[in-house]
Amino acid sequence: MRRVTDSRADEVALNRALWAVVNERFTDAAADELWARPDAVWGLFEVPERELGVFGEVAGLDVLELASGSAYVSAWLARMGARPVAADLSGEQLATARRLQRRLGPVFPLVQCDGERLPLADGCVDLVVSEHGAAAWCDPQRWLPEVARLLRPGGRLVFLTNSHLSALTVPPEEGVAGEALLRGYAEAYRVRWPGGGVEFHPSHGDWVRLLRVSGFVVEALHELFAPPDRADHPFYEIVSPQWASRWPAEELWVARRA
């Protein structure tokens, strides 16, 4: 059985504790509206999937939502005809997902596990999706090879994460991204926040290299801006809509397993 290093195990435990708090303060209450949405959206400012088209035709596909949180993306995909499995580190967030499955449906498997070590068989899925999950909270040198193991040949990986530029300009203590660079280019690769939690924000070059060595071919990178008239996010202090109207708030990557 593979083991994680003590330092990484400590980071995973720290992230698990952080997301228990976040679920209590925000994600549990927010999940009802997200599960009930008729159409899929992406990111802090809810960019419609119909404008991006990154899912493609998912009916009949086996899908893994990695670091799923309350699994609302899996709910959207299930309604589109996919067969999702949602996996997350946080038992609290998966409890929220179960509550919404009972209240709204649909029902699909929920798995509590580390996104860097998944208890699933090789070649078991056609599509892996992660919306602000694995890309920020898991070590890319661990989770990308794991996803490659799970995907069938030609399967796709679609993941959303904070933009590298936002990671360079978010203050270390509190507040949203500004116009000054507060970290060196490589310093954002691994960020340990004072309030708890360890995030990963590789540069574009890092992502391309990491994806290639894990057996992926990059198909697209969508840089997401805030649409006009968007309000501040009700909970996450990352970027303001004013900032995100000028610079990309998030990056949506699409890659295919070779």
Task: Briefly describe each language-model feature range.
Residues E116-L127:
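A short acidic, Gly/Pro-enriched loop at the edge of an enzyme's catalytic core
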Residues L127-Q141:
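A short SAM/SAH-binding and catalytic strip from SAM-dependent methyltransferases
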